[in-house]
């Protein structure tokens, strides 16, 4: 029997990002309102799993890249690794920041008083926001995620070394589960580091049973997330487990029926830009336009298409300005 590959490929990573960005839009559109009914509100809350998916993929991807080169295990190698990661993150964030903030202030009237308050030093707040450190007090409230991922990037070398000891991993996993933000990132590191062991184990099971089990568990966990009152088995605590099931479903299905997940991967490639801009569209500047479509599916589709269109424009602008050439220059500078 041929050996199946259950490692998460780049295509499958992008597909999962595509799922995550759709979940993010659904979450932000509906989690604060009962206007469209209780079911839609619950689905909006379930969409919060997007955070866990992005964190899991970050932990998995960082570990995969880190292990590809033994030079990374040296102090200089680790610094170079983090430098390259931060260059990619900050350049893409700053590109949108430097367009969106001036445009928001001067064209749409979203002054700095609104996100930063009237009793703060706006220049200092703008600087810390530019560095991705403002949490929910960012010019765009959705950018709170920036500070979280920056912290995890800095912690990554330490966490990677801790996962070298299997007994410590087994002891730490239940503890990690107690912290909803940390858990998926740490799970990503562990799964990636021991992906050969995971692959060996999954190859002992029938391919279809893995897909079926992952699908059933993902659906069940969504119900449990919203309906359970059991401590640590509801809300964001359970999102890391749901993410594992979704990842297994995507990878498992690719082993049963080879697919390139074309639509999801396309969205995944634009997920960073869509994350950075979608709140400007549906919350700050064009709320009436998005919600005028009345039906939840159409509302999501409207935000999805407008966010995607804006991302495409951003990518075209990057090409015109030789953004990626400049990024490559900086990546190879150190």
Q: Model-derived features: where do they sit?
A:
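Membrane-cytosol interface segments of multi-pass membrane proteins
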Residues: 1-174, 210, 258, 266, ...
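Alpha-helical transmembrane segments and terminal signal-anchor/GPI-anchor hydrophobic tails
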Residues: 4, 179-275, 280-288, 293-302
